[in-house]
Structures are given as structure tokens and as C-alpha cells.
Amino acid sequence: MSDHQNASSAITLDRLDLHQPMRVVDIQVPAEQPEWRLWLEEIGFIPGEPVCLLARGMPGGDPLVVRVGASTFALRRAEAACVRVEAAS
């Protein structure tokens, strides 16, 4: 989590433009959903991992289709909002 203190340019995954190459900085889950952290980490959202938003569902933008590493997942906006990312270098 030390990255998050240095990552002033970090934004949450749900706010990305489509096809923008990023990397995971950290995960910040709501207090009422602590189990989301482990679940997101288990499916590959770990610091340094490449991530890209591929598509948004309609209406309302749910779910989001996200590629992390070599895997593709559908996430709800609330879940994607827990993943902080920054531009891939």
C-alpha cells in the first residue's frame, strides 16, 4: 500500500476511458465489504498488474468488462471502484 501514497495520479478503475493501458496501484474496499479485497486479489488485481477497461454495459454502465493480466472479467461498478490504477509506464 505504500504505492498509494506516491500515486497522486491514481484513479479508480470504474472511471477509466476504454482501452487505456493502466496498472493496478492498490485496492480500497468499503468497510461493509471487506471480503472484496481478497476476492479482487485472487482474480488478479494486485499492485503492478496491467489492467484495461474493454467495455461498459448499458444502460448505466454495468457491468464493466476488464482485462487484468491475461484474464478478462465482468465487474460491477462498485467493485471496479475499489481498484486504484495509474498509467502504465
Question: What is the predicted function of each stretch?
Answer:
Residues M1-E41, I46, C52-M58, D62-S89:
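Compact, charge-rich alpha-helical regulatory domains located at protein termini
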